[in-house]
Design a protein with these regions (language model features):
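Cleavable N-terminal export/targeting peptides
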Residues: 1-60, 400-401
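Gram-negative and organellar
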Residues: 46-401
Length: 401
């Protein structure tokens, strides 16, 4: 399949513009401690015109959230290999920072940055992995029902990717990709509990080896409805048009066609649901179901269809946070086949993922964290199958103002 460029997979239903770990602080809300003086002042001043005005402290111009995480663990398949697995202990560090400007009149601004580095202590082929992600977003509200946002995202990835896109050469490789994506989002709050959003973006990916350099255009439409009793649902359609700088088309038999240019179009349809319940809503559950149809501009050699489901559960008892994410995906290729003979089987690929994360707050700023991640890919072509297990244990420091 094509190596897919960076695409934000939004699982949250209301906003989902930042990673899952930062969904809660994405919106600037007036705390209860600041709301109480307002109520008290209005009560005391009713009928007392001569009473002195209550001084209400102004909100700070900027809100800041920062965290640093350090973990140690073990990964049993660094190269995503079906044989000859390379295993290693690992050390990983992650830093995050979120800046939000207090809305002034109709404008608001936020920026989020995340950096992550992994060192494999016994790695031979792969010694290090790293990634960096930066997003800035400027918002403008011309009216109470309209919001225009312009996010700009830059990213860098240096890691092992699965490049199993042909049956001629199925492999994994260490790739370095630098990219950026930018484009406007226009949201219409047509009801107090529903909104409609249209978005467009342009994306550029540059690889260290130049193998998959190209441009991608995005266009999408999303609908979200907040129901009663903590229920929320949504649906969306997203289209992506990708043009490679140097990749060429393939014939139906898997041969390169010199002098051609490869392009593709992906249409993705999704349905999402979420629910919060309990006192102070410690329980959260989400579910996303999607279908993707990919077509190339040549013989259809890279045509494929994907079905994916993503359940997610979160529980926040006092001092704890437990998060479970799972995903299952099936990929069916239209022309690519496996085996030899007069009637070879169409190529099929199944992928499964599960991730468990546990956090225990030890103090206002410190937390202990542990996690386990499992990934499995199965295909009727054995060389494209692999399994990965990763366990982590460490600490997290966070600060906000």
């Amino acid at each position: 399949m094509f190596f897919r460029p960076f695409v934000s997979r939004e699982h949250g239903l209301s906003e989902g513009r930042l990673p899952r770990s930062l969904r809660d602080p994405i919106a600037l809300r007036l705390p209860l401690g600041a709301a109480f003086p307002l109520l008290l002042a209005s009560t005391l001043c009713a009928g007392r015109a001569s009473s002195p005005a209550v001084s209400i402290p102004a909100l700070p111009a900027w809100s800041t959230f920062a965290s640093v995480e350090s973990v140690f663990g073990y990964k049993d398949n660094l190269l995503l290999s079906s044989a000859g697995e390379e295993r290693s202990a690992l050390a990983r560090g992650t830093a995050e920072i979120l800046l939000m400007r207090t809305p002034t009149q109709a404008f608001e601004y936020s920026a989020f940055a995340q950096a992550e580095g992994t060192r494999f202590l016994q790695g031979e082929t792969v010694r290090n992995e790293s990634r960096f992600w930066l997003r800035q977003e400027l918002g403008w509200r011309p009216g109470p029902q309209w919001e225009l946002q312009f996010p700009v995202t830059g990213y860098f990835d240096d890691k092992v990717f699965d490049q199993s896109d042909t049956e001629v050469e199925r492999l994994t490789a260490v790739l370095r990709v630098l990219g950026a994506i930018a484009g406007p989002n226009l949201r219409w709050d047509f009801h107090r509990s529903a909104w409609l959003e249209v978005n467009a973006a342009a994306q550029r990916d540059v690889y260290a080896d130049g193998s998959n350099d190209g441009w991608t255009r995005h266009g999408g439409l999303r609908l979200n409805v907040s129901l009663s009793r903590g229920w929320e649902t949504g649906a969306g359609v997203n289209s992506r048009w990708r043009a490679f700088d140097s990749r060429e088309q393939y014939s139906a038999s898997g041969r390169i066609l010199p002098g051609t240019s490869l392009r593709s179009r992906e249409d993705e349809y999704e349905v999402r649901m979420a629910r919060k319940w309990g006192t102070a809503e410690p329980w959260k559950a989400g579910f996303r179901c999607s279908f993707l149809d990919c077509r190339d501009n040549g013989s259809g050699y890279f045509d494929r269809r994907e079905w994916q489901v993503e359940p997610e559960f979160e529980w926040k008892p006092a001092g704890w946070r437990l998060l479970l994410r799972t995903a299952a995906r099936r990929v069916e290729f239209g022309i690519q086949t496996v085996g030899v003979g007069l009637n070879p089987s169409p190529r099929i690929r199944d992928e499964y993922e599960a991730e468990l994360r546990v956090e225990r707050r030890c103090s206002e700023k410190w937390s202990m964290i542990g996690g386990f991640r499992w990934e499995r890919a199965r295909s009727n072509e054995r060389v494209a199958s692999y399994e990965v297990n990763e366990g982590l244990l460490g600490a997290r420091w966070s600060w906000e103002r």
